[in-house]
Amino acid sequence: MTVATNVNAAGVDREVATQELNRELQDKGFLLTSTEDIINWARTGSLHWMTFGLACCAVEMMHTAMPRYDMERFGTAPRASPRQSDLMIVAGTLTNKMAPALRKVYDQMPEPRYVISMGSCANGGGYYHYSYSVVRGCDRIVPVDVYVPGCPPTAEALLYGIMQLQRKIRRTGTIVR
């Protein structure tokens, strides 16, 4: 009797009601979820990344794809074309001459697209911050989702940045309403 009253009561938290229903249906082999949750789950487990390696950080990025760290176990796969990738990893010093090329490649990526800025130079100019030819952070050219600090950052730091991006995708969602 009280269960029926609580379900119809005004102000009941939908999340709690959904969790209770999930527990009941789980015993019978069913799962209750939304389409958006399924899409976000699939998107976090299938990031296709493209490198924009500009300097020393690109070497550390290559380490993450090798057998010791094996980035693919986190559900990421390298792609050579921006039209096939949804994650761009900017690694290294971005110069004023290279900035239009970075923006052009970013614009060729399909939506939703994500950017990881890897290393001090990509994050804010790094050692060359005061040079006339260096962009002081790739976030002045493209929107950045995750910053990975270091000079150069370790392969573990990049893997942690990818896991943070996956967490962000799960948390924020990707469907535009």
Curated annotation (Swiss-Prot):
Catalytic activity: a quinone + NADH + 5 H(+)(in) = a quinol + NAD(+) + 4 H(+)(out)
Statement: the UniProt record of this protein carries the keyword Lipid metabolism: no
Chain positions recorded as [4Fe-4S] cluster binding sites: 56-57, 121, 151
An example Gene Ontology CC term for this record: respiratory chain complex I
Protein localization: Cell inner membrane
Cofactor(s) needed for function: [4Fe-4S] cluster
Membrane association type: Peripheral membrane protein
Record-linked SUPFAM superfamilies: HydA/Nqo6-like
PROSITE patterns for this protein: COMPLEX1_20K
Cofactor, how bound (note): Binds 1 [4Fe-4S] cluster.
Keywords recorded for this protein, A-Z: 4Fe-4S, Cell inner membrane, Cell membrane, Iron, Iron-sulfur, Membrane, Metal-binding, NAD, Quinone, Translocase, Transport, Ubiquinone
Protein function: NDH-1 shuttles electrons from NADH, via FMN and iron-sulfur (Fe-S) centers, to quinones in the respiratory chain. Couples the redox reaction to proton translocation (for every two electrons transferred, four hydrogen ions are translocated across the cytoplasmic membrane), and thus conserves the redox energy in a proton gradient.
Family according to the record: Belongs to the complex I 20 kDa subunit family.
PANTHER family named in the record: NADH DEHYDROGENASE, NADH DEHYDROGENASE [UBIQUINONE] IRON-SULFUR PROTEIN 7, MITOCHONDRIAL
Self-association and partners: NDH-1 is composed of 14 different subunits. Subunits NuoB, C, D, E, F, and G constitute the peripheral sector of the complex.
Protein name: NADH-quinone oxidoreductase subunit B
Gene encoding the protein: nuoB
